Amino acid sequence: MTNDALFPVDSETGWVSGLRQLPSPNCDARPEGAQVEVIVLHGISLPAGQFGGDAVIRLFLNQLDINAHPSFLPLKELQVSAHFLIRRDGEIFQFVPVSMRAWHAGISSCLGRSAVNDFSIGVELEGTDTNPYEEAQYRSLARLNQSLIREFPAVTADHLFGHSDIAPDRKSDPGPCFDWPRCRRDAVLLS
């Protein structure tokens, strides 16, 4: 597979080939008849502003040591996940099959509907609102988005949203440093 090749999505299992797969317990079945229509982009770092550790992965696997950092204490009972995490170096992890509902959006609305987890795929980018995202992340995100757009016809470049778009009173990620024009342009350039 070349660097620009799409990731094969197994429509039976929901797993994407070529990615590191770490199954999260923080997911469940989508409601009957629900189809993927949007991709929601998030920004995350644990501790805030620190990159490269395994805390985000541990959070999504319910293995975070809350005593490892004072900022982790409020996360003690939190059960969250996303379908994907893109690290600063562009490595992509998959936690939840795309056929399942990951617990990433929280209280939110999109396309005039609530319960966004029902019809979305969540992609976490390792980062913060105030730090520009890395070139490697944009390249990996472009390949992933195009692979998902090819798999799910209802998803288009116009159906890429930030967490801040679907929960504006609660969330600000992926933040003002995220290059939305590039993201949308790259999502269609690879097709």
Predicted regions span which residues?
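N-terminal catalytic cores of peptidoglycan-degrading enzymes
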Residues: 1-114
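Conserved, mostly hydrophobic/aromatic
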Residues: 41, 123, 141
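Basic/polar, cationic surfaces and motifs that engage anionic cell-wall
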Residues: 2-15, 33, 114, 119, ...
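Residues immediately flanking
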Residues: 43-44, 125, 164
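Conserved beta-strand segments that form the floor/walls of ligand-binding pockets within enzyme
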Residues: 85, 122-124
